[in-house]
C-alpha cells in the first residue's frame, strides 16, 4: 500500500473467518479488518500503565511538546490493532502463532477522537518444508486515520 490515502475497501476476504486456511490467503490481497475510535481517556489510561511519557498522560504538558497535544502511545495503537486482528481476521482454529515481527513504524501521531481503519496485506506465503499441510503467511499491517493518512 502506498503512503498516501491508503484505506482499502471494506473487508473483502472471500472466505468467512471460521473457514480460512493457508490456501485461502493470496499474496497481494489487501483486506480491511476493523475500525477503532481512540479516546483521550483510553490514551491516558494506557499510558499511565505502560508508556508514561508526558505527551501521553498530561494534556497541558503535551500542548507544550513538539506534538502540540496529547497523542496515543504507538504501543497502544499496535495493541488495539492486534485486538482487531484477532477478533476480525484470523481463524482461531487454524492460526498457529507467529514467528515474530520484522518492523514497526509509527508514521503519524494518533490523537484523541481519531478513527483508525486497520488493514492487512498478504505479502507472501511460504509452505513448511517439514510439514506440508501448514505454512507461514507474511503480512503487512497498517492503519489509516479518518483523513486516509497512514499512522
Residues covered by each model-derived region:
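HotDog/MaoC-like acyl-thioester-processing domains
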Residues: 1-27, 106-115, 119-151
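Hot-dog-fold acyl-thioester-processing enzymes
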Residues: 2-100
Amino acid at each position: 500500500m502506498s503512503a498516501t490515502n491508503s484505506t482499502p475497501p471494506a473487508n473483502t476476504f472471500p472466505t468467512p473467518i471460521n473457514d480460512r486456511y493457508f490456501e485461502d490467503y493470496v499474496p497481494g490481497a489487501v483486506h480491511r479488518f476493523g475500525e477503532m475510535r481512540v479516546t483521550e481517556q483510553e490514551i491516558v489510561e494506557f499510558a499511565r500503565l505502560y508508556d508514561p511519557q508526558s505527551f501521553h498522560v498530561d494534556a497541558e504538558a503535551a500542548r507544550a511538546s513538539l506534538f502540540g497535544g496529547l497523542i496515543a502511545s504507538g504501543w497502544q495503537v499496535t495493541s488495539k490493532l492486534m485486538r482487531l486482528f484477532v477478533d476480525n481476521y484470523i481463524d482461531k482454529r487454524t492460526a498457529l502463532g507467529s514467528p515474530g515481527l520484522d518492523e514497526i513504524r509509527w508514521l503519524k501521531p494518533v490523537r484523541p477522537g481519531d478513527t483508525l481503519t486497520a488493514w492487512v496485506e498478504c505479502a507472501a506465503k511460504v509452505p513448511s518444508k517439514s510439514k506440508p499441510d501448514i505454512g507461514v503467511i507474511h503480512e503487512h499491517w497498517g492503519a489509516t486515520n479518518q483523513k486516509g493518512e497512514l499512522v
